[in-house]
Swiss-Prot record:
Belongs to the orthoreovirus mu-NS protein family. Residues 1-13 are annotated as: Interaction with sigma-NS. This is Protein mu-NS. It is found in: Host cytoplasm. Residues 14-40 are annotated as: Interaction with mu-2. Residues 471-721 are annotated as: Involved in the formation of factory-like inclusions. The gene is M3. GO terms for cellular component: host cell cytoplasm.
């Protein structure tokens, strides 16, 4: 990504300078101070991007003085399981300063990372393996990338011990021992001249050794890559551009060895030994759109076993020449764009973590640009992007190459403001359609004549003869180049003859230029002695490493046995799932863990039954007492109910008696009332007939009686007597 060079470290914005001048004029003798609030640029990237797009010249910034850090040189010894130990040294960056506190654990972890064969031939382990010649910082970077890709974890001081334990758990128990005559088994690396075996002593005492020395002198100089962080930017970007055009051998193989090897294991390649297209086993990744037709972008037959798999088949015998996993850009690009803004991991990040070379079609590039989600799709450090999946299609049409290169330079927000016309021309030009139509006419040409463009032995000239002179008639240009390509089958034979002639010339020169071959005999004998001594030391070192590995295995076994003995005799009823995870963390064998958990389950069941029986026995007495009390209370309740029924009967009898008495009393009262009425009537008749004076009724004087006036006058008139 291009860097913004609008301001240097001491540059002052124009508006700020004008404001300072005006303040000096208004207040002489005083030093002007900026009233613009300081902004931390590391946390204001969106503000800076917006200011650049709008062409603003006034951007507040803050100058931070970074203190100097005294970094010491640290040396570590890495002991791979399948080769000899080697030392790496260098300084540790301040961001990884916490590693100084755990150097022994770091050496232990690096031993596993330097032994990719311990992880069941994982491609990720091979890609991030630590090799001799690396600097310490490059080895730490490889270790961090290994942890991120294999364990999906981030290296921190808090979880460093957990990471080391997890790496040991993943590593296979079988450790391969390096033999004296180790050979590289990867036929692809040997085929493409990318073998980087360790240095070996060459005996030049005979003609065979001299021929071998001459062969080594004629080969290109190859050195180990110092790591991505130390690659010259021009070399790195040149290599990415070559991969983009399907020209991996044109990149500097000192840095892109692994990527080139993966490329020729994925994409269609012509095998000169078998005389046909190689049968590829490794699968690649294609980012494409849902509506494009992939069959129109290759000269091979296209077979789709399922919705996510694409096979390229040879047109002669239908064997598989390339395998790809198809991923639709519409499904992953929007989510990846949102994940970048939120700082999360996307599906596309997981796909990129498992490969080094990917393919993206021209239509997919245009789709991400059109929808504004192109950031982080092609500009990745850990993958090399190839436009298209058929090398011949990309080499002949160049569809999408310019657009992909533009997206590798800047983010889309910057391109929309600074390179809008260029972006418009790449999105709306009709040249891609014309080249695509011309390529369809190529499919009708001879299939055998096109095989030379998939021949890896053409080295840097791979694909260069296509369209050397571009004419207005694209179809005629393709036909001319196809006619010329039919003469390229003799090139490998001629190159082999040239190499043999060079070997003969060098051998003759070495023999003729040696005036005193006898003088070299002592040196050669000394060289042979040193070689035998080195071989003996290597064998002793190998035996020592084997004994050391056996001792470490015995120690681990003893620790495991002691722990197993304790766990077997320890009585516990804890059968929680977390307990099984803790036993797994201390590396207890799965069968032992299963036996322990089953035993705990049985003990827990026994204790539950025992506690149930004791509780039942203790509660039985109380239950009996309560039962007896319940019986007594039931009897009392029965007696009370009988008494209540008896009382109810008595009450009913009393009520009946009272009712009868009331009736009797009522009758008697009615009789008395009637009798009273009768007597009253009789009294009235007698009163009318007899006049009774008060003096006759009482001997008491009338005056001495109170309320005499209220008394009834019973006097009877005398005339009625």
């Amino acid at each position: 990504m291009a860097s913004f060079k609008g301001f240097s470290a001491n540059t002052v914005p124009v508006s700020k300078a004008k404001r300072d001048i005006s303040s000096l004029a208004a207040t002489p003798g005083l030093r002007s101070q900026s009233f613009t609030p300081s902004v931390d640029m590391s946390q204001s990237r969106e503000f800076l991007t917006k200011a650049i797009e709008q062409g603003s010249m006034s951007i507040p910034y803050q100058h931070v003085n970074v203190p100097k850090v005294d970094r010491k040189v640290v040396s570590l010894v890495v002991r791979p399981f399948s080769s000899g130990a080697f030392s790496i040294s260098g300084v540790i960056s301040p961001a990884h300063a916490y590693l100084l506190e755990c150097l022994p654990q770091l050496e232990q972890a690096m031993a596993f990372v330097a032994s990719p064969e311990s992880f069941q031939a994982s491609d990720v382990a091979k890609r991030f393996a630590i090799k001799p010649g690396m600097s310490l910082q490059d080895a730490i970077t490889a270790f961090i990338n290994f942890v991120s890709a294999m364990l999906k974890m981030t290296v921190t001081r808090q979880n460093f011990d957990v990471i080391v334990a997890e790496i040991e758990r993943l590593a296979s128990t079988s450790v391969s021992v390096r033999t004296e005559e180790a050979k590289v088994a990867d036929e692809e690396l040997m085929l493409f001249g990318l073998d980087h075996r360790g240095p070996q002593l060459v005996d030049v005492s005979d003609a065979k050794g001299i021929m071998k020395a001459a062969d080594i002198q004629t080969t290109h100089d190859v050195h180990l890559a110092p790591g991505v962080g130390n690659i010259d930017p021009e070399i790195y970007n040149e290599g990415r551009f070559m991969f983009m055009q399907h020209k991996p051998l044109a990149a500097d193989q000192s840095y892109f060895t692994l990527e080139t090897a993966d490329y020729f294991k994925i994409y269609p390649t012509y095998d000169e030994h078998d005389g046909r297209m190689a049968d590829q086993k490794q699968s690649g990744l294609i980012l494409c759109t849902k509506d494009e037709v992939l069959a129109e972008q290759t000269i091979f037959k296209l077979d789709a076993p399922d919705d996510k798999t694409v096979h390229l088949l040879d047109r002669d015998d239908d064997h598989v020449v390339a395998r790809f996993t198809k991923v639709f850009i519409e499904d992953v690009a929007p989510g990846h764009h949102a994940a970048q803004r939120s700082g999360q991991r996307s599906v596309l990040d997981d796909l990129y973590a498992n490969t080094q070379v990917i393919s993206i079609t021209s239509a997919a590039l245009k789709w991400v640009v059109k929808h504004g989600v192109s950031d982080g799709i092609v500009n990745r450090k850990n993958v090399k992007v190839c436009v298209g999946f058929d090398p011949l299609y990309t080499l002949s049409t160049h569809n999408g190459v310019s657009l992909c290169a533009l997206l590798m330079d800047e983010k889309l927000s910057v391109l929309n403001s600074a390179c809008r016309m260029t972006l418009r021309s790449l999105m709306k030009t009709g040249r891609d359609v014309d080249a695509h139509r011309a390529f369809q006419r190529v499919l009708s040409q001879g299939y055998t004549s096109l095989m030379c463009y998939y021949h890896p032995s053409r080295k840097l000239a791979y694909g260069e003869v296509l369209f050397l002179e571009r004419s207005n008639d694209v179809t005629d240009g393709i036909k001319l180049q196809l006619d010329a390509s039919r003469q390229c089958h003799e090139c490998p034979v001629l190159q082999q003859k040239v190499v043999e002639l060079e070997k003969q010339i060098i051998m003759q020169k070495s023999i003729q230029s040696d005036p005193t071959p006898v003088a070299l005999q002592p040196l050669l004998s000394q060289l042979r002695e040193l070689s035998s001594e080195v071989t003996r030391l290597q064998m002793e070192l190998s035996r020592a490493q084997s004994l050391n590995a056996q001792l470490e295995a015995d120690v681990k076994s003893a620790q495991s046995c002691s722990l197993d003995m304790y766990l077997r005799h320890h009585t516990c009823i804890n059968g929680h799932a977390k307990e099984d995870e803790l036993l797994d963390a201390v590396r207890v064998a799965p069968d032992v863990r299963r036996e322990i958990m089953e035993k705990r389950s049985e003990v827990r069941q026994g204790w539950c039954e025992r506690i149930s029986k004791e509780a039942a026995a203790k509660c039985q007495t109380v239950i009996d007492d309560l039962t007896l009390m319940n019986g007594k209370q039931a009897q009392e309740i029965t007696e009370l109910r009988d008494s209540a029924e008896k009382y109810e009967k008595q009450i009913a009898e009393l009520v009946s008696t009272i009712t009868q008495n009331q009736i009797t009393y009522q009758q008697e009262l009615q009789a008395l009332v009637a009798k009273n009425v009768e007597l009253d009537a009789l009294n009235q008749r007698q009163a009318k007939s007899l006049r009774i004076t008060p003096s006759l009724l009482s001997a008491t004087p009338i005056d001495s009686v109170d309320d005499v006036a209220d008394l009834i006058d019973f006097s009877v008139p005398t005339d009625e007597l």
